[in-house]
């Protein structure tokens, strides 16, 4: 609660970038199109594709003098190997098919939200102007938090008699282990954008020095005292500069409200019920499985293989056929649910039982919600939408490249003899920062990795040269030279990644970092 500021989601960036990518993929340019930076067989790399890939690519791939050119060559390498992967049928591999199915589900859910929620949102100019005007008012406040209403009102009554400062100082003095002081409970100047709407509604009319009655917020009770209020003017120039930013802010605030309403209205008629006993068994089994030092098997595989030495997992095994989730006219057994559930989506540590179970409940709800959303999206033909098809193509190409790379390098094995020779030939690489030369035995794993990477790189470069003989590769240098990218020393040394907030997946694939190792 120390920092009441909220941040505006970065989804607008993700949405904008995905729109650009899908737009680029769907275009049918001729070879003379000035937007094309390269041609690889029947595949085209647009200036937009290159720019996005470069900006969010790994920093160590941009160290050469002719950075854009060499980065483009990496993209061409991947395109060539990807095309060869398709020829070899690697797009039919289990790994590619599984990833494709998972991505399709994500894209269908996103597309359904876009159609049902985003397309219905209109932000009027008057709303934007009013939001900008409201942002000229700033509050500075201090607060106190209690976990229950009774304690909060007792402290509120004490503050009405003795004042905020004296009461808080006495509480802090009697609890020195908390290691806090008054400054820890103060904010800087906040606008209406920084304060949760339900809190702002309660404090907006408070006078300076006035203490609010306890305000329930996210399961706790807040006492707030306004210490200062400032108001500033705003010019027409300020309005113009702030217009687009505030339009985005209002859009995403409205999106959050409408999305919640859409989910509620969509799911309530399904009458979904989760069985409590089966949930406890699942929570216990998942907790034990996650505490293992290594898990080569999936969670479901571990459960199905459980024996008497694993009583918690065995109990789960014995209940796989039990009904876990019911909804209108249908139900799921525990096993049917696990076939749709990703146990790695639970990030909380098992020892934090309360948080672990809270996240598990949330992910169960998301799994059920997405199941229904995907069915709805397919029934409306969204699996054939341009955005979904284009994104599947982009990622499938990446996965097929990865399969091709694995296909050609899988036989590379580095034994101790080869590793020892590599170490002797590159001994200076392993000297420590304090100038110590380590023994081979101390760095053998790293040496084997380095030797493997070098062999794989040479092998792939040879294969790529062979592929170029059968595929037209053309670079439009004139277009490449016109592409503007971040090119400062700082940007070249910093990795900047863009992830989707909904899934944690990269917003789009970028060049494999292995090319620069």
Would you name each region that the model predicts?
Residues 116-142, 156-161, 408-438, 452, ...:
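Acidic/polar surface patches and capping/hinge elements
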Residues 11-19:
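Sec-dependent N-terminal signal peptides
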Residues 62, 94, 98, 153-201, ...:
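Peptidyl-prolyl cis-trans isomerase
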Residues 26-110, 114-116, 250, 254-257, ...:
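N-terminal targeting/tethering segments
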Residues 2-12:
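Bacterial N-terminal signal peptides that target proteins for export
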């Amino acid at each position: 609660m120390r920092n009441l500021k909220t941040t505006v989601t970065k989804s607008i960036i993700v949405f904008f970038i995905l729109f650009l990518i899908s737009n680029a993929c769907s275009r049918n340019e001729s070879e003379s199109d000035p937007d094309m930076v390269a041609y690889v067989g029947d595949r085209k790399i647009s200036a937009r594709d290159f720019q996005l890939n470069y900006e969010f690519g790994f920093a160590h791939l941009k160290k050469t003098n002719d950075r854009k050119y060499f980065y483009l060559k990496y993209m061409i390498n991947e395109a060539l190997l990807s095309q060869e992967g398709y020829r070899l049928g690697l797009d039919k591999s289990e790994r590619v098919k599984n990833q494709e199915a998972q991505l399709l589900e994500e894209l269908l859910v996103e597309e359904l939200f876009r159609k049902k929620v985003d397309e219905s949102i209109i932000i009027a100019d008057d709303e934007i102007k009013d939001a900008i005007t409201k942002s000229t008012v700033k509050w500075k406040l201090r607060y106190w938090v209690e976990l229950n209403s009774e304690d909060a009102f007792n402290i509120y009554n004490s503050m009405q008699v003795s004042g905020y400062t004296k009461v808080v100082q006495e509480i802090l003095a009697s609890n020195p282990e908390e290691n806090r002081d008054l400054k820890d409970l103060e904010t800087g100047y906040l606008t209406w954008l920084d304060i949760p709407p339900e809190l702002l509604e309660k404090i907006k009319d408070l006078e300076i020095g006035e203490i609010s009655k306890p305000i329930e917020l996210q399961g706790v009770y807040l006492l707030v005292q306004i210490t200062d209020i400032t108001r500033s003017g705003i010019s027409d120039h300020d309005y113009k500069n702030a217009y687009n930013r505030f339009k985005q802010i209002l859009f995403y605030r409205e999106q959050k409200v409408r999305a919640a309403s859409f989910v509620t209205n969509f799911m309530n008629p399904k009458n979904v019920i989760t069985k409590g006993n089966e949930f406890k068994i699942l929570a216990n089994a998942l907790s034990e499985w996650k505490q293992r030092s290594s898990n080569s098997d999936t969670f479901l595989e571990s459960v199905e293989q459980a024996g008497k030495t694993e009583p918690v997992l065995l109990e789960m095994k014995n209940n796989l056929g039990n009904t876990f989730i019911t909804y209108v006219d249908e139900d799921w057994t525990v096993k049917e649910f696990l076939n749709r559930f990703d146990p790695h989506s639970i990030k909380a540590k098992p020892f934090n039982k309360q948080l672990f179970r809270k996240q598990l409940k949330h992910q169960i709800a998301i799994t059920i919600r997405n199941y229904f959303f995907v069915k709805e999206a397919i029934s409306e033909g969204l699996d054939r939408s341009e955005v979904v098809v284009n994104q599947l193509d982009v990622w499938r190409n990446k996965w097929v490249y990865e399969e091709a790379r694995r296909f050609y390098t899988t036989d590379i094995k580095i034994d101790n003899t080869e590793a020892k020779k590599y170490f002797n030939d590159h001994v200076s690489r392993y000297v420590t920062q304090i100038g110590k030369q380590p023994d081979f035995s101390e760095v053998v794993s790293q040496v084997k990795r380095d030797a493997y990477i070098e062999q794989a790189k040479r092998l792939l470069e040879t294969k790529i040269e062979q592929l170029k003989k059968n595929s037209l590769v053309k670079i439009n240098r004139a277009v490449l030279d016109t592409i503007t990218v971040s090119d400062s020393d700082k940007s070249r040394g910093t990795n900047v990644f863009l992830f989707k907030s909904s899934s944690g997946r990269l917003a789009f694939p970028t060049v494999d970092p292995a090319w620069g190792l």
